[in-house]
Amino acid sequence: MFLEIDRLMNTFVPAPGGAFLQTIIGSQFPGKPKFLPEKIPHTIDLDVDAKSIAFEIQAVDKDKPTILLAHGMGGCSESGYIKRIAAKLGLQGYGVLLINQRGSGSGMGLSSSLWNGGSSEDLAKMIDYFLMRHPHLLLIGFSLSGNILLKYLGEGRSIPPGLIGALSVNPPVDLRVASHIISTHRSSWLFNRYYMRLIGN
């Protein structure tokens, strides 16, 4: 499992200007994926009144695990960073699953509520859904979905044997502290406006 993750990851070098500037640049200048394969849609029942739409890029190398990508707050399966990573993984032969959290992306309007930092049951249902279709999954959660992924793994549930690895990218492990930093940083007005616009859309 760890060797597999090591092969996927390069040494991280932060952008000049720190994390805030990197977040802004990544969202405002998304670039174009080099590889845009056909995506197969999946409709997943999360609750009686909630559905999620996820998309699958089929594997070229059937011996490799399928990788599930979970977006951060205000994002969706169409977010630039999700598509860039999916494109790179697809070029390496991996099957890729691009999920949308409850009320996000293509699932907007299909739920009576929105996802939050405690939505581990939604993630569990998506994992179970895809494990019925793929024998081995590797999970990658970004930002708030990274926090949900850690919550899913640490709740004492029985972890399915087909789940062979998990990677949490920049998770706000302490949501209260993360909220305080975003709210009090000198650039907080910019982040609040940016996220409120994303959530409102």
Label every PLM stretch briefly.
Residues 73, 100-104, 172:
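Short beta-to-alpha linker loops that shape the active-site pocket of alpha/beta-hydrolase fold enzymes
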Residues 64-72:
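Short beta-strand element of the alpha/beta-hydrolase
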Residues 19-62:
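N-terminal cap/lid segment of alpha/beta-hydrolase-fold proteins
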Residues 83, 87, 124, 128, ...:
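Short, hydrophobic alpha-helix immediately C-terminal to the catalytic nucleophile
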Residues 88, 102-138:
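Catalytic nucleophile-loop/oxyanion-hole region of alpha/beta-hydrolase
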Residues 138-201:
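Alpha/beta-hydrolase-fold enzymes
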Residues 73-80, 90, 105:
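Short substrate-entry loop that stabilizes the transition state in hydrolases
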Residues 81-98:
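Short amphipathic alpha-helix adjacent to the substrate-entry channel of hydrolases
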